[in-house]
């Protein structure tokens, strides 16, 4: 278990001590998606979902989730985020409506924001599902994945085009 930083000498979980790490700018981008039927797509676009503006509420949920990631993920450090942005893009093909979600997170600190970006993308997708499930419970969420991250000891990461979903 030597290779895992989240275990102590007894093999039990611990939160990693980051006090000696350098303060640097850290960024991360994660993506998710929600596949919906035509009725849901048209109602979201037309502002006809009874619970309200789906994309506005989902966007706020994503920002809130990023800010509260350490409450959800046990070994995540509480971070002071300097920016969170949630964006949407529709992909429409014949009888196929896919809402692409991108969550970008930024901080200046001692640890990265990958989990915050992934949590934001996930919570955004879950909120879309929650607000539309009365119409169709067959929506499909995902895949959810890290696109890129910058900063830190381990350097930058960018998912290759062959790894992209």
From Swiss-Prot:
Q: Which UniProt keywords apply?
A: Lyase, Molybdenum cofactor biosynthesis
GO terms (molecular function) for this protein are: cyclic pyranopterin monophosphate synthase activity
What are the disulfide bonds?
none
Q: What class of enzyme is it?
A: lyase
Which ranges of the sequence are coiled-coil? none
Q: Which reaction does it catalyse?
A: (8S)-3',8-cyclo-7,8-dihydroguanosine 5'-triphosphate = cyclic pyranopterin phosphate + diphosphate
Q: Name one Pfam family in it.
A: MoaC
The yes or no answer to whether the keyword Lyase is present is: yes
**UniProt keyword annotation of Lyase present:** yes
SUPFAM superfamilies xrefs? Molybdenum cofactor biosynthesis protein C, MoaC
Q: What is its EC number?
A: 4.6.1.17
Tell me, which GO biological process terms does this entry list?
A: Mo-molybdopterin cofactor biosynthetic process
Q: Where is the active site?
A: 130
Q: Which positions in this protein are listed as binding substrate?
A: 75-77, 115-116
Q: In which pathway does it act?
A: Cofactor biosynthesis; molybdopterin biosynthesis
HAMAP family on file:
MoaC_B
Q: Spell out the family assignment given in the record's similarity comment.
A: Belongs to the MoaC family.
| Quaternary context | Homohexamer; trimer of dimers.
Q: Which NCBIfam families match?
A: moaC, PRK09364.1
Q: What does this protein do?
A: Catalyzes the conversion of (8S)-3',8-cyclo-7,8-dihydroguanosine 5'-triphosphate to cyclic pyranopterin monophosphate (cPMP).
Protein name per Swiss-Prot or TrEMBL: Cyclic pyranopterin monophosphate synthase
